[in-house]
Design a protein with these regions (language model features):
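AAA+ P-loop ATPase mechanoenzymes
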Residues: 17-162
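Intrinsic disorder/low-complexity signal
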Residues: 1-12
Length: 162
């Protein structure tokens, strides 16, 4: 085995733990050459690229070579259960402004009340967002269904979240 540093890791996609759904988490084994620790951000590459927050895998998953992610992350990466993805640790920049667009039928309309910016900000705090991703803000629902946002566009230069 060489002393070269490994840049990425190949893992097979598995279903997320129910409590992780919608939180942008990826459960990965820590006994790997990427030196990952909880809270790190990884880029997940399948057909497309997305990002997730690293969480410790379950003990029974430690030697299986899998990454547990939810359906939103799988869709953003363009992969299905059982597909192989490549992950690598990345450094992120905080975004100052994030443009969100609710995913809904053309005839549906939604109006958000005052305070929605703070609610969204708290729900997305420290979550990695890649331009074009679909995301779910925990606790934000419409008619008891999760409200999905698409065409996400993070901006670095602006000073407020709208």
């Amino acid at each position: 085995m060489s002393n070269e540093e490994v840049d990425d890791l190949q893992l097979r996609v598995a279903k997320a733990i129910p409590s992780d759904v919608g939180h942008g988490r990826a459960r990965v084994p820590f006994d790997n050459d990427l030196n990952l620790k909880p809270g790190d951000i990884v880029e997940i590459t399948g057909e497309q690229k997305t990002a997730a927050i690293v969480w410790r895998c379950r003990p029974e998953d430690a030697n299986l070579g899998i990454i547990r992610v939810d359906g939103i992350i799988r869709k953003n990466a363009g992969v299905s259960l059982g597909d192989k993805v490549s992950i690598r640790k990345v450094e992120t920049q905080p975004c100052q402004k994030l443009i969100l667009s609710p995913v809904m039928a053309k005839q549906q309309k939604v109006r958000f009340g005052p305070g929605i910016e703070g609610f969204a900000r708290r729900g997305l705090n420290k979550r990695p967002v890649v331009s074009g991703d679909r995301i779910f803000i925990p606790g934000m629902t419409l008619f008891a269904e999760a409200l999905l946002f698409g065409k996400v566009k993070p901006l670095q230069k602006e000073s407020s979240l709208e």
